[in-house]
Structures are given as structure tokens and as C-alpha cells.
Swiss-Prot record:
<dbReference type="GO" id="GO:0006412">
    <property type="term" value="P:translation"/>
</dbReference>
<comment type="similarity">
    <text>Belongs to the universal ribosomal protein uS9 family.</text>
</comment>
<dbReference type="InterPro" id="IPR014721">
    <property type="entry name" value="Ribsml_uS5_D2-typ_fold_subgr"/>
</dbReference>
<dbReference type="InterPro" id="IPR020568">
    <property type="entry name" value="Ribosomal_Su5_D2-typ_SF"/>
</dbReference>
<dbReference type="InterPro" id="IPR023035">
    <property type="entry name" value="Ribosomal_uS9_bac/plastid"/>
</dbReference>
<dbReference type="GO" id="GO:0005737">
    <property type="term" value="C:cytoplasm"/>
</dbReference>
<dbReference type="InterPro" id="IPR020574">
    <property type="entry name" value="Ribosomal_uS9_CS"/>
</dbReference>
<dbReference type="GO" id="GO:0003735">
    <property type="term" value="F:structural constituent of ribosome"/>
</dbReference>
<feature type="region of interest" description="Disordered">
    <location>
        <begin position="1"/>
        <end position="36"/>
    </location>
</feature>
<protein>
    <recommendedName>
        <fullName>Small ribosomal subunit protein uS9</fullName>
    </recommendedName>
</protein>
<keyword id="KW-0687">Ribonucleoprotein</keyword>
<dbReference type="InterPro" id="IPR000754">
    <property type="entry name" value="Ribosomal_uS9"/>
</dbReference>
<dbReference type="Pfam" id="PF00380">
    <property type="entry name" value="Ribosomal_S9"/>
</dbReference>
<feature type="compositionally biased region" description="Low complexity">
    <location>
        <begin position="1"/>
        <end position="29"/>
    </location>
</feature>
<keyword id="KW-0689">Ribosomal protein</keyword>
<dbReference type="GO" id="GO:0015935">
    <property type="term" value="C:small ribosomal subunit"/>
</dbReference>
<dbReference type="GO" id="GO:0003723">
    <property type="term" value="F:RNA binding"/>
</dbReference>
Amino acid sequence: MAQNEELTAEAVEAEETLTSYTSESTSAEDAPKKERPALTVAGAAVGRRKEAVARVRVVPGSGKWTINGRTLDNYFPNKLHQQDVNEPFKILDLEGAYDVIARIHGGGISGQAGALRLGVARSLNEIDVDNNRATLKKAGYLSRDARVIERKKAGLKKARKAQQYSKR
């Protein structure tokens, strides 16, 4: 019995020690939620990545995606590409608030997904610069990824791959 009292006394003392180091901070639920004005404005932009070019229109709606006349699930069957494309809406808490209409050509699947994400982010930035720009910029969604395939050089098999060289 005495041991239990000692353990509880130690536990209470440890709890008091720990609480002395913590601060009173507001949790995410207590923080006042910033009200966004209801926007009925459409935005349009162009996104590019590698060889892919995406012309994107974002209009107020129910969250429907139309890419070259097909749905998002149909055009990008890979869930990673679907998530990648939808990130600008997630980070701004605007999922389901806008419909996306896009025309994409050139490049491969990954390049097209990157181009579409940039186009969507630029469109959302155009709609409401004051509220959206800082968040999108911090996440890196407004930056064009300038990496492209290096050209093949004469005398080499590929861009950098050369014939094996023997010094002796």
C-alpha cells in the first residue's frame, strides 16, 4: 500500500514538473477560422512541365474535373497523379468548390500531371491573389519546374554516356 502511494506521489510530481515546461497555447480547434469570401470568379492559366503543356480553366462548381473531355480518374488512373493534381485545392481548403476544365498535350503522364498542377495553382492564384498567393508560394506550387531532358551530344551514345576509354 505504501509503495502505491509513493508511486502516485512520484507520478503527480512528474506531472507537475512537465506542466511547468508547457505553455498555454490555443489548439487548432480554438483558433478563429478565417472566413473566405464566396468567390464566383473563374480563373485561367497555363502550366508547363517537361514537354507537357496544360491550359486550365477553374470555374465555381462542385469539384468536377474534365481533362481533354475525360474525367480525372479516367485520364490519370494512378492515384499519385490524382493526388498531385489536387494538392493546390487541398492546401487552400477549396476541395469541391471549383470545377476544372483542362486541355493537355505533349509529354508523358507525369509531366502532364505536373503541368496540370501548376496550371490549377496559377488559376487559383489569379482568382484570389490576396488569400491564396502566400500559401501556394510557400508550398512551391507557383514555381515552374525547369528541369528538362539534356540533349544528346555528337560522339556520345546518349547525353553523357561515352564509349569505354582505356588509358593503356
